[in-house]
Amino acid sequence: MKLELTPRQRKILWATVRRYIATAEPVGSKTLAQSYNLGVSTATIRNDLATLEQVGLLFQPHTSAGRIPSDFGYRVYVNDLLSSANMDGIPNDAPQPEPHPALQQLLDQLNRELGDDLDSFLQRVAQLLAHLSGCIALITPPQGPVVAVHHVQLLSVGPGRVMVLVVTDSYQTHSALVSPPDWPDDRREDLEDELQLLSNFLTLKLRGKTFAELQDLSWLKLDEEFRAYSHWLQQLLRSVVQRYLRPSLGQVFSAGMTELMRQPEFSQAQRMQAVAQLLEEGSEQLQGMIGLYSTPGCLFTSEAALSAPSAREKASSSTADQDPSHNVPVIIYIGSENPLESLHHCTVIASVYRRRSAPLGTVTLLGPTRMAYERSIAAVQTVASHLTRALA
């Protein structure tokens, strides 16, 4: 059955959620009447609050308290009411659609300071996002078949072992140990020279090719000089590609535990410990939620989150000309929508950053369900958009 709310009930739900997000205190009819121009008596507001509670949008933590939003109430707020400010008579009490007035400038500054040190850059971005949002920020590094090769180097690391180092165009380094080829007898004394010659050849042949393209690369037509190595080169590339395209469990740049501890919802040690344990020990579970794995775009597929267009998606068409980051889609899990039970008291907001329209990595905020949704959504969009441009 479709939920039908009167315009006044929509206003009251909107105001209740906004007030609770701002204060973390249950909201009563008197507070709403004093703080918002609803144009009705406290008795009428009280009746509407009771109706909103009956349909599951609000609840009372105890009998004498005001109301607070349920997970369902937050979902209606995010999917429907965020885009309705200044519409249907819903008041607009200083909304904050931008994550921080200087976020983009701060991201640009980090780019200049850290240059090609991608890992340090992503860690600093996670710290910045956590500081501005008051939530835990999680960023996965670039992965997937669209990352391309920039340089290849072969090194002898001991008897019978060769290390292949691959530097990608996103400034990451990947390595694998392989057995050396069967060197021709007249070249065994020139091992280092041969490895350098092969390194130069591989760099020239592979630069600009994605890891997906390496899987189908043919080594049948080689110059006479390298023909003896064709089988070994095929095995080497297969080893590198399989190692790179295998899901990376555990590599997540994170920050914000201290910020989250300041939230009143996490004053209970049990809740904080559950999140901390997930971040420290549950890398496989966490990557199952925020990782890309081998399926492009498999990030967050909650039916509840996708059952209606998000407010941000609705608003993006009117704001795209002002800020392209508003076109970045986000997926949101609220409370019990989270697949992990330890996050049933949390909201997760996530997006992907891309190259060539394919997902590279993820940007995620994890915080209480009482989250400043407008600001948090905008922050995730801004960071994802920046990483897409920076790693293009």
From Swiss-Prot:
GO biological process annotations for this chain's record?
negative regulation of DNA-templated transcription
Task: Give the matching Gene3D superfamilies.
Answer: 3.30.450.40, Winged helix-like DNA-binding domain superfamily/Winged helix DNA-binding domain (1.10.10.10)
Question: A Pfam family in this protein?
Answer: HTH_DeoR
Give the originating organism.
Synechococcus sp. (strain JA-3-3Ab)
User: Belongs to which family?
Assistant: Belongs to the HrcA family.
Q: Tell me what this protein is called.
A: Heat-inducible transcription repressor HrcA
Q: Which UniProt keywords apply?
A: Repressor, Stress response, Transcription, Transcription regulation
**Presence of keyword rRNA processing:** no
An example Gene Ontology molecular-function term: DNA binding
Function as written in the Swiss-Prot or TrEMBL entry: Negative regulator of class I heat shock genes (grpE-dnaK-dnaJ and groELS operons). Prevents heat-shock induction of these operons.
Q: Which InterPro entries match?
A: DeoR_HTH, GAF-like_dom_sf, HrcA, HrcA_C, WH-like_DNA-bd_sf, WH_DNA-bd_sf
